[in-house]
Amino acid sequence: MLMPKRVKRRRVHRGRMTGQATKGNKVTYGEYGLMALEPAWITSNQIEAARIAMTRSIKRGGKVWIKIFPHKPVTKKPAETRMGAGKGSPEFWVAVVKPGRIMFELAGVPEDKAREALRLAMHKLPIKTKFVTRQEQEVKGGEADEN
């Protein structure tokens, strides 16, 4: 399970997820990627389940990059506890994902295998996602520069 080794503060505010992802929105390491289309908190267990699904699908071929990390602690109070008495203790960790963020990348496998592996990972995640390739992004980037 992914979680930070050390943190400055044990409890953080919930925050808001507004706008598009400005960082991590391009396929940088691999050839294929899985892009988030909705904002969400992705838990460390969901990231791990998606990673296992992908690695089992591609077997020993190819390489997988996880481009999100759960930095945010989510607190919970025990069941049947009265209100007040402070904030609860950290229960699990989440990664804050905005639309446009590339969450996983793959390389070293044919496109059909990559599509299948990322499709399996999609089903482990609580949001709508999209399969993207590095070539698609380079073409789109070139069109934007010309206009």
UniProtKB/Swiss-Prot annotation:
GO molecular function term, any single one: structural constituent of ribosome
GO BP term (any one): translation
Keyword GTP-binding among UniProt keywords: no
Chain spans, region Disordered: 1-20
Cysteine pairs bridged by disulfides in the record: none
Domain of life: Bacteria
CDD domains: Ribosomal_L16_L10e
Keywords for this protein: Ribonucleoprotein, Ribosomal protein, RNA-binding, rRNA-binding, tRNA-binding
Record bears the keyword Cell membrane: no
Alphabetized PROSITE patterns for the sequence: RIBOSOMAL_L16_1, RIBOSOMAL_L16_2
Gene Ontology cellular-component terms listed: cytosolic large ribosomal subunit
InterPro entries documented for this protein: Ribosomal_uL16 (IPR047873), Ribosomal_uL16_bact-type (IPR000114), Ribosomal_uL16_CS (IPR020798), Ribosomal_uL16_dom (IPR016180), Ribosomal_uL16_sf (IPR036920)
Pfam families recorded: Ribosomal_L16
Basic residues: bias regions: 1-16
Subunit structure: Part of the 50S ribosomal subunit.
Stored NCBIfam families: rplP_bact
Similarity-based family: Belongs to the universal ribosomal protein uL16 family.
HAMAP family attached to this UniProt entry: Ribosomal_uL16
Function: Binds 23S rRNA and is also seen to make contacts with the A and possibly P site tRNAs.
Name of protein: Large ribosomal subunit protein uL16
Organism annotation: Alkaliphilus metalliredigens (strain QYMF)
Gene from which the chain derives: rplP
